[in-house]
């Protein structure tokens, strides 16, 4: 081929330089569709010649129903020299290894050849009768698998990890563990670190259960330590509590500094007979802590119908009546301890339990004063007050002992600081006169002073006309006049460490709860 002809055939002439170098045919759209079909057939052709899918193995424990079931003894299954050489008695685990060994002895040997025909498969039973794989329907499909299963589940764990002391029955498991042991740690939310995943999972199960249990049952509240019962009957050391009036541990957290310890020096004996309980002091110490959180409730009463205003301003110790009374929880009374009210002629009087603590220190004693006559003359009452004064001079604990009865319209209030009871008449003038007489007998009485007509000594912002508090701790709590009408006459002091000026002064060693 000449150069001119090459140039003519390859390089277009100058006259046709405006035409493109590659000239596409301007045929119809049928040619384009034919090309697409040819291209798609070329792509799909290799897939059409894909090899047939492989036969899947049966899952462990689900053998082929047509398989041959082989049951080997534990000795045979765990034997390391199952196949023995006839020449040197050397054992081998597999028959193929024995055949290869026979070549060294110039003995005829034969390896298993793959057969073109279908070979009947074998399944192996676990020799342990209690194992699930002892059932032919749960047999394992290969000899190695049944061996490892028997070693892991029923055999001795001979291989031990030096790092975590975990033991393995199969050497391959031990080697695999040794490669990763100590390289990864598992940290629980509680801060405990584990090197083993199984230990971590076990710990998390207990830790999560503990967290859930703590969320459902928080810290044991003070209620669980308080014996509560409905109506009458024996109760705990903190008194008989009505429904809904149980103590809560939140109250303790709100008032951390009150330091209440009622068990020092006292023995609380609960008697179920006669629906009452006995409070027996272990010593002659009369100091029992009954102090209001607001300095207003040494003697806390529930108001009755006749002297509502008086009861709202003062507090007297309240005890249960001889008959059943209905205790109901209430937060209207703001005393630290609100003690059960006890009326002889009212069978269903309701006691207002406090919002802070609910208790009625039932210091009931079986004396003859309970059944005394309701009509007592003024002379008898005066004689009783005189006796109280003489006894109080020698024993401060008998300060509130006596005064066993009142008139028909009186409301009975049992105050058991020394074991006796005070019967307060609704006519406050009678009680005022009795208290004045007692003060006169006890320490050279004044013109109108009462043992309850006192003032606050340490608290300058509180006057005697505002509060009625007898503080047995000696921190300045006072008791003011019951009637709010008693004069401020001279106040005497009793013997035995009791002062009638309103401050109960006792020897230092007689403070079982410490000085406030």
UniProtKB/Swiss-Prot annotation:
Residues 484-495 have a biased composition (Gly residues). The modification Phosphoserine is found at residue 73. InterPro entries: C2CH-3rd_BIRD-IDD (IPR055187), C2CH-4th_BIRD-IDD (IPR055185), C2H2-2nd_BIRD-IDD (IPR055186), IDD1-16 (IPR031140), Znf_C2H2_sf (IPR036236), Znf_C2H2_type (IPR013087). One of its GO terms (biological process) is asymmetric cell division. Induction: Down-regulated by gibberellin. One of its GO terms (cellular component) is nucleus. Residues 1-26 have a biased composition (Low complexity). This is Protein indeterminate-domain 4, chloroplastic.
